[in-house]
Amino acid sequence: MSKRIALFPALLLALLVIVATALTWMNFSQALPRSQWAQAAWSPDIDVIEQMIFHYSLLPRLAISLLVGAGLGLVGVLFQQVLRNPLAEPTTLGVATGAQLGITVTTLWAIPGAMASQFAAQAGACVVGLIVFGVAWGKRLSPVTLILAGLVVSLYCGAINQLLVIFHHDQLQSMFLWSTGTLTQTDWGGVERLWPQLLGGVMLTLLLLRPLTLMGLDDGVARNLGLALSLARLAALSLAIVISALLVNAVGIIGFIGLFAPLLAKMLGARRLLPRLMLASLIGALILWLSDQIILWLTRVWMEVSTGSVTALIGAPLLLWLLPRLRSISAPDMKVNDRVAAERQHVLAFALAGGVLLLMAVVVALSFGRDAHGWTWASGALLEDLMPWRWPRIMAALFAGVMLAVAGCIIQRLTGNPMASPEVLGISSGAAFGVVLMLFLVPGNAFGWLLPAGSLGAAVTLLIIMIAAGRGGFSPHRMLLAGMALSTAFTMLLMMLQASGDPRMAQVLTWISGSTYNATDAQVWRTGIVMVILLAITPLCRRWLTILPLGGDTARAVGMALTPTRIALLLLAACLTATATMTIGPLSFVGLMAPHIARMMGFRRTMPHIVISALVGGLLLVFADWCGRMVLFPFQIPAGLLSTFIGAPYFIYLLRKQSR
């Protein structure tokens, strides 16, 4: 059986090599007659423009694709090995978003010189790394704390970047293409800088081979074998962060390879660390090589697209196809080294207090605000005039926050993975892509089609996840990997459409950022009715949600039918997410963070966890919507972005408090 499992991806890999080689041959032949290849490679004739392009653009581009792909495969294995999480990749600790934020700032301030942008990218990545290490240091750099801190800091940097894009859309137009990766070269300078740096990274990785191998074991076992765990994690993650920042400097952000290459290496039978490092690097180089040659061909026959988009569009279907053949994979226990507050008693009192606090927040959001004359508390006739404008927005934020928080709670309990959230399942991205696609297909004002288009996108995404994960018995991690594959592909497609410069994308940019701007009374009533129905179903699932975090074997032992249970919970979470996304757009924070905040406050039993998560999610988004309307009055900041600014520091504080 294992030979059959290994044979299939091996044949697939061989097919990809053949296709990449054929495409390279065809692209090179179109650019220059084969009889001139040797001369153009070694000493191009400066009077023949085709030879100059071949020597200074095509060949360096091929070399950089192989180098960057290999580097992404290498750091993907490093992150997955150190964090012991199959979903970890170079963007997990926020390295890519930190580097992107640095580049955005230099672009916005028009700081000249290539070295300035490279330094900014390195500085952004290193600052993010230091923040993440600082938060997790007190817990001996435990994998779960590192993952959560990295995700939150990554979301925070991404929110700042998106905010700058909203207010400086035209100035940062060039950033969209870079954000999805571009391998365009004009000389050999990039290759000459990158290959010695990567070689140094490989040598340091080999020096860390034994500690890295031990880090794949349980923490207690690794310590008993004499490993200084915190120091080893710090060294390995620092190395991975530096290599990732170098790759971002070279070509921008190219996602998915760091996730996909290590998984395919495992499928090919590379169980030991050294073969896995080598094989993942080869697979990464192959995928990026193939993607770039497809781009060169598309540029000639259609239009230029970004490298990261094609990489995701190649990798996502491949991963979905290979998922049923993926052996069982595991994630770190969410409770390892966990020193959360003691389980809270008197849950009803806390829930009532939270409900009162939420009601007060709604009243303040309705009545207190700014106008042309300053701060005012609206009442009487003025409040009646403001109600049609403020009421739908506040209710939309409240309902969406509650639904995303409950969906996040269900998904994290269903999968037992601390990285799980509605956004990771790809349903939000699928809904957003459906809306954007409809915007391009329907002439005139397409916003009337927002709900059906988004619902269809979410439904198709869910269907693909269920088909891909269903053949593997609905393993939680297969669901997450399928969701991540689709989410990455949809996100890259959205960024590619943004980079196209089409004016229609500016219309939907605010909605994508999580704005309540277009909320209407009718939409809020529909959302409220659906929310009440879905929340009424949730308590019926409490036994499942209590038992599933204990593991599949325990669930079977008490007579639970695992596959139908997982399908039902996945459907419930998907409906909650899709409804919230249709109301205010795809958010990137509440569904991930609200369940963790509730758990760290001491609510770990199923129903208290769900109730407090819902209250936290609703409060967070109501407050975020009010701040978004008032902070830069008369300008507005989308609630989805501002919820990150409000929630992330508090979440980091809770993580830090745990580690003391």
From Swiss-Prot:
Please give the annotated consequence of changing M175L.
Answer: No effect on ATPase activity, but 50% decrease in Fe-ferrichrome transport efficiency of the FhuCB complex compared to wild-type
What result is annotated for mutating T184A? Answer: Loss of binding to ferrichrome-FhuD
Q: What induces it?
A: Induced 2.1-fold by hydroxyurea.
So what does mutating Y517A actually do?
A: Loss of binding to ferrichrome-FhuD
What is the recorded phenotype of mutating D170A?
Loss of binding to ferrichrome-FhuD
Can you cite an annotated GO cellular component? Answer: plasma membrane
Is-annotated flag, keyword Cell inner membrane? yes
Instruction: Classify the protein's membrane topology as the record does.
Output: Multi-pass membrane protein
Q: What does this protein do?
A: Part of the ABC transporter complex FhuCDB involved in iron(3+)-hydroxamate import. Responsible for the translocation of the substrate across the membrane.
Family according to the record: Belongs to the binding-protein-dependent transport system permease family. FecCD subfamily.
Name of the protein this chain belongs to: Iron(3+)-hydroxamate import system permease protein FhuB
Q: Which organism is it from?
A: Escherichia coli (strain K12)
